[in-house]
Design a protein with these regions (language model features):
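Pyridoxal 5′-phosphate
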Residues: 1-391
Length: 391
């Protein structure tokens, strides 16, 4: 399928106001997603929140098969969660770590996840083991295969890190984890919506995702994929009367599906908005979206490489829509602010979010420009010209 870029831009209100190169932070939503979210909020105001939810029952239930279609799962393996970090937390903290258990992760791991590793290690005596990178700067799957053993409780990586275009070889990692009988948690915060993800091929037990980034959904939305066979043996760290039923004075019974990871209260308008955004991704097709993002990001890398004093900092054999770079002798935060005044949105990734990777490479921070399908080649030209003038 060929994407109609002019139509996509016309259906994205923000395109008329900003040159948005921060999809990896929070992408511009479509008018359709915006309308569906606002319509439900208005309905809540007009007839009441409970009543609005009852009236929107079919839309709310439609969220689960929409997400399942996107990632190749079953609807019963999907839970709505308010963001990717909380979805990840629900999976991670529900695991029963014991002294000596090993958590295998990667150099490019996200700070929130790593802080959780540290906390669990401190409380339980589990050990954190960082698998080294290969020559491409991605996780060395050969090293992973050698390092995984009977002590390994979990393999946990970020599919696409926040600080660059690297796409980790998630399927290769999954094959190794599955062969060893080890649980596999994939942070797909930056990958789902950007590139095709099939959980059966990836082989993950859990996958966490946010709505606001490449799916172009509302903030405050996300989901957790929990493989049915894995869910059956895990009790979530939190339960309420949505995740479980109070079946006797001293008894409760959990739901049998992934919704045991949900709680009763949620952002109902956001569920509908994320469902609509997911529908749009399914309609456009992830192969077409991925092809467009690869084209734009490679075009941006070529343009940046032509500027004196610009060094690309992306790693990986396969690179995606997040483009990071450093500007010699410049204050990246000051450049970001100068661009913002021109209605050009980029951001700066720091060791705060990517300590292991950036520190290992001697980088305090890097500039990050992340494209989406609504961006154009003309916008890339404008950005590079403005960047050159801002340093």
């Amino acid at each position: 399928m060929t994407l109609d870029i002019a139509r996509l831009r016309a259906e994205t209100p923000g395109c008329a106001h900003v040159l948005h190169l921060n999809a990896a932070g929070s992408a511009l939503p479509s008018q359709r997603t915006l309308d569906s979210t606002l319509d439900h909020l208005r309905l809540e105001a007009e007839i009441g929140g409970y009543e609005a939810a009852a009236k929107a029952h079919d839309q709310l239930e439609g969220f689960y098969p929409a997400v399942a279609q996107l990632i190749g799962a079953d609807a019963g393996e999907i839970a709505f969660v308010e963001n990717a970090t909380r979805a990840w937390d629900l999976a991670f903290y529900s695991l029963d770590f014991k002294p000596g258990d090993r958590i295998l992760t990667c150099m490019s791991e996200y700070s929130s996840n790593y802080i959780s590793y540290l906390q669990v290690a401190k409380k339980t005596g589990a050990e954190i083991v960082v698998v080294p990178d290969d020559n491409y700067g991605q996780i060395d799957v050969g090293a992973l295969e050698r390092m995984i053993d009977k002590r390994t409780k979990l393999v946990s990586i970020s599919h696409v890190p926040t600080q660059g275009g690297l796409v980790q070889p998630a399927e290769a990692v999954g094959k190794i984890a599955n062969a060893a009988g080890v649980l596999y948690l994939l942070d797909a915060c930056q990958s789902v919506g950007q590139l095709p993800v099939d959980v059966a091929k990836v082989g993950c037990d859990f996958l966490s995702m946010t709505g606001r980034k490449y799916l172009r959904g509302p903030r405050g939305t996300g989901f957790l994929y929990a493989r049915a066979a894995t869910t059956a043996g895990i009790e979530p760290i939190f339960l309420d009367n949505h995740a479980a039923k109070w079946t006797g004075d001293n008894e409760y019974t959990m739901r049998s599906d992934a919704r045991r990871f949900e709680n009763w209260e949620r952002y109902f308008a956001g569920v509908i908005g994320l469902k609509v955004a997911t529908d749009q991704a399914n309609e456009l097709g992830m192969e077409a979206i991925w092809a467009r993002l690869r084209e734009l990001s490679e075009g941006l890398r070529v343009r940046l490489s032509a500027l004196k004093g610009i060094t690309l900092t992306d790693l990986g054999q396969v690179k995606g829509a997040i483009v990071t770079f450093s500007v010699a002798g410049a204050d990246h935060l000051a450049i970001k602010e100068k661009l913002r005044r021109q209605a050009i949105n980029v951001t700066v990734s720091t060791q705060f979010s990517s300590r292991l990777d950036l520190k290992n490479r001697g980088l305090l921070n890097v500039m990050r420009a992340s494209v989406h399908i609504y961006n154009t080649e003309a916008e890339l030209d404008r950005f590079v010209t403005a960047l050159d003038a801002a340093r």
